[in-house]
Swiss-Prot record:
It holds the Pfam family Ank_2. SMART domains: ANK, CAP_GLY. This is CAP-Gly domain-containing linker protein 4. It comes from Mus musculus (Mouse). The modification Phosphoserine is found at S556, S608. Residues 360-371, 423-432, 440-461 have a biased composition (Low complexity). Keywords: ANK repeat, Phosphoprotein, Repeat. It comes from the Eukaryota. Residues 303-345, 504-546, 643-685 form the CAP-Gly domain.
Length: 704
């Protein structure tokens, strides 16, 4: 049924609805408005509707502008529209729209759009909260769902991390509504949605308002188990890794302790299930195991615990890196020396292999007790600092090496002492530093069956096994036939040029790091961090980077451009809240999110395979004249230049802003890239702008 099919209904006044004489009072019938494109002024210089523009205001307040056209305006994911949700929404109501009527393209109501408009960095939270309260007073039904996403208002508010809207919605809802499920998220609750998208504010508010932290989705996962694993996040997402740790701990703390009458013999309870779990993993008590590829010890306990639900493993570590003596909360699960005991989920442990030096770098397919992301063989990760563990691998002809000066002392490491370490600290500084790539080593086999490893003279007490070559990706490996040497010029993160001065382990973070002296003062130190001098250079000329971020400098500008465009932006669909629904791309966007939620294999694969707005980036490229959004200031700008620059490597965008908030007139130094008014120009990386919700780094022609 459409608006044109409605019969004439006599209007009745009321104290609240009297402000909107066209509302259908006394009728719960809602309609779905036909699909329309957003109206735009004929002389408009930009590609979106701006309610603050005079010509756009004429269209907005024109009674001839239809409800379908106003819904089309609401679909535009730009601050100018989302921050004026109340103005546009009231115009929709004034044109005779029922408060629960839906947009024909997205099947969303005004309340759904309002929950979206509270998103940080795009909308205005205060405006969204006031308008949501107004809609609920007018009779908006918070339980209505979009038939495309199956999400209700609470789900949208949780997805976009708007705690204030969550409180408004649940204030008038039934207690059970807080745990309403959504099929698009494996029939998880709003708490699952917030946890999966790292919405800390939403998680905290939902828990305060009675959300069930032990609710299991269709995959048997509680909210704590859908939090992305920090080990699968790239280095530039260290902040997200810290948030993930905080959210997971918050959810685990909220899970009620299991009430059983056999607490005194808790370590022996559920013995059959524990034995079955161990058997499926090929383990038994007393086996040597590795925890998340990081710590090595002996399996002493397996079963349920008082401190958390599910099956847990108790391990006695080889080194005093644990947290207890086998007891937690006055319950003794096993016995060991203080600081040698640690507990871990069964999904985080694996049997310590004897032939680890020949371990291949392929995803492990061992069974896990919960449906989780596919785990990766951790033999190639670097051990935690001060763990005393070293890694030994079989040397292959194709592996490149980093050659150190002959004056360095060799360090001998027995093969039997080699371990399978891996950095899985949840802190913000240790999120998957090695990017799950193999970094070959230079090994010299001795007659005694041992291998000697060269160590860095800059830090003789800390450099241990495993000097690694820089292998940024499979694509880049093809032209990394030679080794990276101390003193060689390299490109750091695809942006900064410098010379390698140091390679080895450090005190400030686990893993192996390059110390690089930059050619320009764009660094962060003088070669020292935390009072430890790793190499010497001028202040602000020194920088440290993991091997995955260092690339041999090529004389080809095309190669530099390719490196820059490939490395400067990594996105994770779970964190993207663009949710853009513009015109024909809406259904493709929904299909994209469905496919990610239902068929996700590994989070690592997601970093590089995410798409938005129905793959629009595959057909649209930024060019001179394109209108983009500068995300750092929420300012619209016009692209005036696309290409390389003299001051830094890679592709840059020259933007002309609409106000004098820039830094130049299109010239930097002695080189002019474009022309505009003084302080109206700025040059930025493509990743700093978006075009219709798509990152500019995805819309750059590699042949620029």
């Amino acid at each position: 049924m459409t608006i044109e099919d409605l019969p004439d209904i006599p209007l009745e006044g009321s104290s609240l609805i009297g402000r909107y004489p066209f509302l259908f009072t006394g009728s719960d019938t809602s309609v779905i408005f036909s699909i329309s494109a957003a109206p735009m002024p004929s002389d408009c210089e930009f590609s979106f509707f701006d309610p603050n523009d005079a010509s756009c205001q004429e269209i907005l307040f024109d009674p001839k502008t239809s409800v379908s056209e106003l819904f089309a305006i609401l679909r535009q994911w730009v601050p100018q529209v989302q921050q004026n949700i109340d103005i546009i929404g009231n115009e929709i109501l004034k044109r005779g729209c029922n408060v629960n009527d839906r947009d024909g393209l997205t099947d969303m109501t005004l309340l759904h759009y309002t929950c979206k408009s509270g998103a940080h960095g795009i909308g205005d939270i205060e405006t969204a909260v006031k308008f949501a309260a107004q809609l609920i007073d007018l009779g908006a039904d918070a339980s209505l769902r979009s038939r495309w996403t199956n999400m209700n208002a609470l789900h949208y508010a949780s997805y976009f991390d708007v705690p204030e809207l969550i409180r408004v919605i649940l204030k008038t809802s039934k207690p059970k509504d807080v745990d309403a499920t959504c099929s698009d998220f494996n029939f998880g609750t709003a708490l699952h949605i917030a946890a999966h998208n790292l919405c800390a504010g939403a998680v905290k508010t939902l828990l305060e308002l009675g959300a069930n932290p032990a609710f299991r989705n269709d995959k048997g996962q509680i909210p704590a188990e859908v939090v992305p694993d920090p080990v699968d996040m790239p280095l530039e997402m260290a902040d997200a890794a810290a948030i993930a740790k905080e959210i997971k701990q918050m959810l685990l703390d909220a899970v009620p302790l299991p009430c059983t009458s056999a607490k005194a013999v808790l370590p022996n309870s559920d013995h059959t299930t524990s034995r079955a779990m161990l058997t499926s993993l090929g383990l038994k008590l007393g086996d040597r195991v590795v925890i998340a590829g990081q710590k090595v010890g002996t399996l002493r306990f397996c079963g349920t615990t008082e401190f958390a639900s599910g099956q847990w493993a108790g391990i006695e570590l080889d080194e005093p890196e644990g947290k207890n003596n086998g007891s937690v909360g006055r319950v003794q699960y096993f016995k060991c020396a203080p600081k040698y005991g640690i507990f871990a989920p069964l999904s985080k442990i694996s049997k310590l292999k004897d032939g680890r030096k020949t371990t291949t770098h392929t995803p492990s397919t061992r069974a896990t007790p919960h449906a989780r992301s596919q785990k990766v063989d951790v033999a190639h990760f670097t051990s935690r600092v001060n763990s005393g563990l070293t890694t030994s691998k079989k040397e292959t002809a194709s592996e490149s090496t980093l050659t150190l000066p002959p004056s360095e002392e060799p360090k001998t490491v027995a093969e039997n002492d080699a371990a399978q370490p891996g950095s899985m600290s949840s802190s913000s500084s240790s999120s998957s530093l090695d990017h799950k790539q193999s970094y070959p080593k230079k090994l010299t086999t001795s007659s005694g069956g041992k291998k000697t490893l060269s160590k860095s003279p800059s830090l003789p007490s800390r450099a241990s096994a495993g000097l690694k070559s820089s292998a940024t990706s499979a694509a880049n490996n093809s032209h990394h036939e030679g080794a990276l040497h101390l003193g060689e010029r390299v490109l750091v993160v695809g942006q900064r040029v410098g010379t390698i001065k140091f390679f080895g382990t450090t005190n400030f973070a686990p893993g192996y790091w390059y110390g690089i002296e930059l050619e320009k003062p764009h660094g962060k130190n003088d070669g020292s961090v935390g009072g430890v001098q790793y190499f010497s250079c001028s202040p602000r000329y020194g920088i440290f980077a993991p091997p995955s971020r260092v690339q041999r400098l090529s004389d080809s500008l095309d190669t530099l451009s390719e490196i820059s465009s490939n490395k400067q932006n990594h996105s994770y669909p779970g964190f993207r809240r663009s949710f853009s629904t513009t015109s024909a791309s809406s259904q493709k966007e929904i299909n994209r999110r469905n496919a990610f939620a239902k068929t996700k294999t590994t989070l690592r694969r997601s970093w590089s395979s995410s798409t938005t707005a129905g793959g629009l980036e595959g057909t649209v490229k930024l060019h001179e004249g394109s209108q983009v959004l500068l995300t750092s200031s929420n300012e619209m700008a016009t692209v005036r230049y696309v290409g390389p620059t003299d001051f830094a490597s890679g592709i840059w965008l020259g933007l002309e802003l609409r106000s004098a908030k820039g830094k130049n007139d299109g010239a930097v130094g002695d080189k002019r890239y474009f022309t505009c008014k003084p302080n109206y120009g700025v040059l930025v990386r493509p990743s700093r702008v978006t075009y219709r919700g798509i990152s500019g780094s995805k819309l750059i022609d590699e042949n620029c």
